Amino acid sequence: MIRAEGVCKSFDKKEVLTDIDAVFEPGKVNLIIGKSGSGKTVLLKSLIGLHSIDKGKIFYNDRDITVMNNKQIKDIRKELGVVFQGGALFDSLSVLENVKFPLNLFSSMTEKEKTERAIFCLNRVNLNNVENLYPAEISGGMKKRVAIARAIVLQPKYLFCDEP
């Protein structure tokens, strides 16, 4: 379970998150709805350890991530799939290399196993035979599906989607 308690975050003295409490359980769908600029992305990035918070606590399976070092947070991140708003694909990597990227960071699979897993995930999002193309060569919708394939390649316990 991921739990936020009293989370506050400011940028340049402008409070973006004010006393946020939330619980996210594996297998459950949660929506965070708000106006543009209301802090949805900041909350997501805080929940996965990409943003520090000013006040409050964020727990992952009852472990306080707000006091963890980068290595400890990295160990947790392999259980979190994230699709960022812009997709965050690497333009210099092929579709296949983009999807394999988390496997290269977090997996001890062989290169053949990584390729098979990445192609399996591409097929899950209905992207067949595009693995050798580059992000500039595919449509915006296809880029979003590549980002989803990359987010699920590690079989995460949680999948966060920012503006899916």
What are these regions (language model features)?
Residues 48:
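Helix-to-loop junction immediately C-terminal to a conserved catalytic motif
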Residues 56-64, 76:
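Conserved ABC transporter NBD signature motif
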Residues 93-101:
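Short coil-to-helix segment of the ABC ATPase nucleotide-binding domain corresponding to the Q-loop/switch region
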Residues 134-138, 142:
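Conserved ABC ATPase signature
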Residues 148:
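Hydrophobic anchor residue at the start of the ABC signature
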Residues 153-157, 163:
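A short, proline-enriched helix->beta-strand linker immediately N-terminal to the Walker B motif
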